[in-house]
Amino acid sequence: MGKIKPDEIRSIIKQQIQQYQQEVASVTIGTVFQVGDGIAHIYGLDDVMAGELLEFQDNTIGIALNLETKSVGVVLMGDGTTIQEGSFVRATGKIAQIPVGAAFLGRVVNPLALPIDGKGEIKSDINRIIESPAPGIICRRSIHEPLQTGILAIDSMIPIGRGQRELIIGDRQTGKTAICIDTIINQKGKNIVCVYVAIGQKASSIAQVVNILQERGALEYTIIVAATADSPATLQYLAPYAGATLAEFFMYNGQHTLIIYDDLTKQAQAYREISLLLRRPPGREAYPGDVFYLHSRLLERAAKLNEKLGGGSMTALPVVETQEGDISAYIPTNVISITDGQIFLSADLFNANVRPAINVGVSVSRVGSAAQPKAMKQVAGKLKLELAQFAELEAFSQFASDLDQSTQKQLARGQRLRELLKQVQHSPLNLENQVSAIFAGTHGYLDVISIEHIPIFLVGLWQHLVNHKPKYGEILNSTNTFSEEAQAILIESLKYLTEEFLPPVK
C-alpha cells in the first residue's frame, strides 16, 4: 500500500472543509415549574403558539392552551406522573394532527388515532390537522339527499338529510345510543362511512357497541374513536375533533359519512375541568366563556359539499344528555341553537314502553324534509298532525266521561299509530316496509286489528309483499315514489290480510 503524501492529505482536508455544511437547528426550551391534575405550567417558552404541541423529557405530549405573560399553561395527553418540576420542555413547532385513511375502517382507536383493539398497527401516510377549518359557504350546497335511519318515527316525521346536524337529546337511559347504533346498522350496503365517537363512556359499554356492530356486519364500514371514562380530560376534549378529522378524509374524497358524538355533555365537562385547572374565569354553570365555540366549530365541520369538491357529505348526530328533561340548561340550549333540529327522547315515554321514546311534538328537523324520499312524503304528510291531535284528545278524554263516536274512532286510530311507531332495537326498516306500515295506519286498515296484534300483522304484511308482490318493492326502489300501481298492490295485500291474517275485533 502506497504512502499518502502530505500534500494529498492537505488537499483532502481542504476539500472536506469546503463540502461541509453546518446545520444549526434552534430549539425553544422551557422549564416545568408546576405540574399536577393533567396540567403543567411552563416558564421560558416565549415563542410558543396557541395550540402548539410540546414534548416533555419523558416523551409525554402536551398542548399549549394558556399563553400568559410569564408562563404557558399546558394540558397533558398522558397522566403526567413521570414529569418533574424543573424538567425541560421542547416546543415542536407543530399543531395536533393525526393519521387518516381507509386503513382505519373496522378499527377502534383513541383520540390520537392509535389502535386500542389489539389488531396491530394501522399504516397510513396521510395526516390531517385535528382542528381543521369548516368548509366555507361557497364550498357547500343545499341538503337534498336523504339519510335513512331505518327508524320509522324519524324517517317519517323528523327526516335527516346527508350533511345535516341533528341533535339527539334526552335523559340518561332513554335510548339515545340505541338510535345511533341502529342508524349505523341501517347504512349497510349504502356506501356510507360511519364514525362513532365515544366520549367519557365505560370501556364495557364501548365493547358492547363494538360487538353489536360486528354481529350485524356494520364494523367493516365504521371507525370507533374511544376516549373512556378513565382517559385524561385532554383526550376526552379532543376525541370529537379527532373523529371529525377521520370523517373529513372521506368527505373530501367524495364519499358520504355519518359521525356520531356520544356525548357532547361529557366533552363539555372535560373542557370545563381543563379550563378551571388553567384558572380561566368560570361563567354559567362554571363552564368557560368559549364553551359555545367549543361545539360550534366542531359541528360546523358537518356539510354537504358542492360538485366541484366531489359532492361528499358529513352528517353529524351529536348526543346531549339532560337532567330531568331540562332542555333549557346551558349545554342543551347551546347545541340546539347550533344544530339543524333535534330528536327529543322522553323518559316518561320510555317508561310507558314506547320505544324508541321519541317525543314527536318537541322533535323537529329544520332541513331533512327537503331530502325526504318522495314516497315517504306522499304517505307521511299528515302523520305528525294526526299524532298531535291524538295526544291532545287523549289528555282531554281522561276527564270526559262519555265520548262521541268520531272521538272514540280518532282515539282508536291514534293508539294504533302510536303502536305502529314502536320498533324493536337493532331492527331498522327499509323504505318499502316503512311506506306500507304508515299507509296501513293512516288509511284505517289497522282499525280492525287489535292493538296487541299490530306488530304480528305488520310482519305478515311485509312477508306477503316480499313473497307474493315483489313488484311493489321494485317500484319503490327504482323510482323512490309511491305510484298508483304500488298503491293498488298495497291496498290489495292489505284487504287480503285484514280478512285472512287476523280475525276482526268484535
Swiss-Prot record:
GO molecular function terms listed in the Swiss-Prot or TrEMBL record: ADP binding; ATP binding; proton-transporting ATP synthase activity, rotational mechanism
Domain of life: Eukaryota
Listed CDD domains: ATP-synt_F1_alpha_C, ATP-synt_F1_alpha_N, F1-ATPase_alpha_CD
Keywords in alphabetical order: ATP synthesis, ATP-binding, CF(1), Hydrogen ion transport, Ion transport, Membrane, Nucleotide-binding, Plastid, Translocase, Transport
Entry EC no(s): 7.1.2.2
InterPro entries on file: ATP_synth_asu-like_sf, ATP_synth_asu_C, ATP_synth_asu_C_sf, ATP_synth_F1_a_nt-bd_dom, ATP_synth_F1_asu, ATPase_a/bsu_AS, ATPase_F1/V1/A1_a/bsu_N, ATPase_F1/V1/A1_a/bsu_N_sf
Record localization: Plastid membrane
Any GO CC annotation of this UniProt entry: plastid membrane
Pfam families: ATP-synt_ab, ATP-synt_ab_C, ATP-synt_ab_N
Keyword DNA-binding (UniProt): no
Catalytic activity of the protein: ATP + H2O + 4 H(+)(in) = ADP + phosphate + 5 H(+)(out)
Amino acids binding ATP: 170-177
Enzyme type, top EC level: translocase
Membrane topology: Peripheral membrane protein
Annotated positions for site Required for activity: 363
HAMAP family per the UniProt record, alphabetical: ATP_synth_alpha_bact
Family: Belongs to the ATPase alpha/beta chains family.
Binding partners and assembly: F-type ATPases have 2 components, CF(1) - the catalytic core - and CF(0) - the membrane proton channel. CF(1) has five subunits: alpha(3), beta(3), gamma(1), delta(1), epsilon(1). CF(0) has four main subunits: a, b, b' and c.
Protein name: ATP synthase subunit alpha, plastid
Gene source species: Prototheca wickerhamii
